[in-house]
A protein has these predicted regions:
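Conserved HGGG/HGGXW glycine-rich cap/lid loop of the alpha/beta-hydrolase fold
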Residues: 1-44
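Short beta-strand/loop motif that positions the catalytic acidic residue
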Residues: 184, 190-192, 196
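Catalytic histidine-centered segment of alpha/beta-hydrolase-like enzymes
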Residues: 221-234
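Gly/Ala-rich beta-loop-alpha elbow adjacent to hydrolase catalytic centers
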Residues: 75, 79, 83
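Active-site loop/oxyanion-hole signature of alpha/beta-hydrolase fold enzymes
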Residues: 34-74
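Conserved alpha/beta-hydrolase catalytic His-Asp/Glu region
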Residues: 128-180
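Flexible "cap/lid" loop of the alpha/beta hydrolase fold
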Residues: 84, 88, 94-124
């Protein structure tokens, strides 16, 4: 938990520990709340695989422990699915919703098969050399040509457990928000990179169109624009979370 201001609950991408988003959290004018899901970062793997609704309930329990009744909710990549599930499951606890580099789940405009194969295993977290070799292909944007940025990102990654990574893949299996997105009434900001091999841009347009109070911001970068366009992203999030705006 970092910062001051209204609370923002953040869900990270598959296999990614909470610490990867620390640069963003330090820039925002809100109190950021995040935690490692089972099998990721400092959390032990769950003995029983969990579905999205179970993880949303876990997040609600975290808020209960902190004494927080309502908050803004943000999800990045895989975490965007969990953010959508939380907003549907706990509409009265969700003030505003931010969906970054994400989609409606398994019913989506898919990436290329080669990208799907790269994402099917946690090898990029386990081998820095492998990550450097494939980063441009799967993340796009600056990672296609900025070797120094790729190596710096690799240095900050914490490998998930195999069980934890496979558990997150299982959580997403068969899950989609496409048919109930219209039920989410909270103001929603959809953020997307124009060169995202993992989540093609069409998915962001679908999210923004299906959400009754959704709008779309795009960034001239790839899947990790949250970090590579940090200053602009932080400004846009702060502006959106200013509850004086409509």
């Amino acid at each position: 938990m970092t910062g001051d201001g209204p609370p923002l609950l953040i869900f990270n991408g598959i296999g990614a520990s909470a610490g990867l988003l620390r640069p963003l959290m330090l820039r925002l004018n809100v109190t950021c709340i995040t935690f490692d899901l089972p099998g990721v970062g400092a959390s032990r793997p769950s003995l029983v695989p969990r579905r999205m609704r179970h993880l949303a309930r876990l997040a609600a329990q975290v808020l209960d422990t902190l004494g927080i009744r309502e908050c803004h909710v943000m999800g990045v990549s895989w975490g965007g699915g969990l953010a959508q599930q939380f907003a549907r499951q706990y509409p009265r606890r969700t003030q505003r919703l931010i969906l970054a580099a994400t989609s409606t789940g398994q019913v989506m405009v898919p990436p290329r098969p080669s990208v799907i194969l790269r994402m099917a295993t946690p090898l990029r977290y386990l081998s820095a050399g492998h990550f450097v070799n494939i980063a441009g292909e799967i993340y796009g944007g600056d990672f296609r040509h900025d070797a120094a940025r790729v190596k710096e990102h690799a240095r900050h990654m914490t490998p998930p457990s195999i069980t934890g990574y496979l558990g997150q893949l299982y959580t997403l299996t068969g899950w989609t928000s496409l048919f109930w997105l219209h039920e989410i009434k909270a103001p929603a900001l959809v953020m997307a990179g124009t060169d995202d091999p993992i989540i093609p841009m069409a998915n962001a347009r679908i999210l923004a169109q299906r959400l009754p109070n959704g709008r779309l911001n795009t960034y001239d970068c790839g899947h990790l624009f949250i970090l590579t366009r940090l200053d602009q992203v932080a400004r846009d999030i702060d502006a959106f979370l200013d509850t004086r705006t409509v």
